[in-house]
Structure formats: structure tokens, C-alpha cells
């Protein structure tokens, strides 16, 4: 089942934007985060080549670890756009990304507020960090989170 919206004559009308932010447990240049930092470029290269990948947020550094979010230096942001949910899921739970995902509790603090969001954007539109912050604030205000 495909989860994108499209028409036969014009192709996709919308693409799936995703954001996730994480609160660092240690400074990015610390030995505790070395494996995470060393994994960024290889995982981003896999994402860039993945079926259904459209775009990802990056700064001049090539990733987004230095892009400010919510004015908090301990938060890092990952934001991307995908053809559909199937493409995003296929990347998230496979290969190198899956291996890093398994270790997230070593590197990032547990939080009790929304740290990720998905939403549809018109095809060709690229969300901003302000868009992502707005989505996360909306979820935090209107959604009950169950945490363990």
C-alpha cells in the first residue's frame, strides 16, 4: 500500500516531511558521542541514495548538528522529506541507520515531550526549522504522550 497522494498526470501532490530532535547527553565533541558523530556521514550518504528520499536539512558542515532548534544548544535536529511513509520506514529500520538507532539511549536524554513529527508538504516544498518547531509545539500542546 502506498501512502503518498498523487494523480496519474501530475505525479505526487505531496511529500512526507519528518522532524526529530534529540537532547544530547554529552557535548558533540565528547568521547561518549564519537560513534554517533562518526556514523553521521555514512548514514546520511545511505539516506541520500535511498529509494524515495527527497531532501534533508543540512548546514555547511554537511549535516544538521549545528542547526539551532528551540534556541537550545543541547538539542540537535534531523529533518527530511520523503516520497511517502513506506520510503521513510524502509530507510529508518534498515542498515546503518538501524544500528545507530539501537544506541540512541547512550547518546540522547529521555524526554517526556514530543520530539518527532510527520506531516505532508506540497511536492517541492522544503520545510524550515520554524515549521518543525511549530509542529512539535502543536503536538506538545494537544497530544497526550505515553512514555515508559
What does each of the following model-derived ranges do?
Residues 6-43:
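N-terminal "first-domain core" detector
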Residues 18-22, 67-92:
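Short, well-ordered beta-strand segments in beta-rich or mixed alpha/beta enzyme
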Residues 72, 85-114:
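An amphipathic, aromatic/His-enriched active-site/gating alpha helix that lines ligand/cofactor pockets
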Residues 103-143:
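A contiguous, mid-protein "functional segment" used to position or interact
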Residues 146-147:
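Conserved small/polar residues in nucleotide/adenosyl-binding loops
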Residues 51-75:
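Glycine-rich loop/turn
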Residues 30-58, 95-104:
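Short amphipathic alpha-helical segments
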Residues 16, 30, 73, 137-140:
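Extended, composition-driven regions rather than compact fold-specific motifs
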